[in-house]
């Protein structure tokens, strides 16, 4: 349901290899002069090949060209790989939305064997 809302409200972009979509993200206008990258994903078979970083650079360039001054992204507290990627791409940790996933998702989420309960919010100035 949340993903459908993102798609309806945002701009959707895909990453392609040999004509096949292997990654995607949605760019949302969330507040004045602020956009957020949501629902970013890369197929597991092609992860760690620079596709996620390329999509994040594309998101930053697209947001900047559209007049946004800030770009935000969020990930779960157990998403250490995602946080490292986002940091390498210029995002900085801003705040933690404690209990976000526990509140908004009926089933517990585990990532790398750890409970994903909090949303780590990150941002970059464009």
Segments the model singles out, each with a brief description of its role:
Residues 5-7, 20, 24, 34, ...:
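Conserved acyl-donor/pantetheine-binding loop and adjacent beta-alpha core of acyl/acetyltransferases
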Residues 73-83, 94, 98-104:
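Conserved beta-strand-loop-alpha-helix junction that forms the acyl-donor binding cleft
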Residues 86, 91:
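Conserved active-site tyrosine of GNAT-family acetyltransferases
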Residues 63-75, 85:
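Conserved GNAT acetyl-CoA-binding A-motif
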Residues 1-45, 56-57, 125-126:
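Acetyl-CoA-dependent GNAT
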Residues 43-49, 77-78:
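Active-site acidic-Proline motif in GNAT/NAT acetyltransferases
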Residues 37, 48-59, 63, 67:
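Glycine-rich acyl-CoA binding loop
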């Amino acid at each position: 349901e949340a993903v459908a809302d993102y798609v309806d409200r945002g701009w959707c972009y895909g990453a392609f290899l040999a004509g096949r979509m292997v990654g995607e993200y949605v760019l949302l206008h969330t507040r004045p002069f602020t956009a957020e990258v949501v629902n970013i994903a890369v197929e597991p078979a092609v992860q760690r090949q620079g596709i996620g970083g390329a999509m994040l650079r594309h998101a930053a360039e697209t947001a900047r060209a559209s007049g946004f001054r800030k770009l935000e992204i969020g990930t779960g507290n157990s998403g250490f790989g995602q946080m490292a990627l986002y940091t390498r791409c210029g995002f900085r940790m801003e705040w933690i939305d404690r209990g976000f996933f526990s509140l908004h998702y009926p089933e517990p989420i585990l990532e790398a064997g750890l409970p994903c309960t909090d949303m780590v919010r990150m941002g970059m100035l464009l």
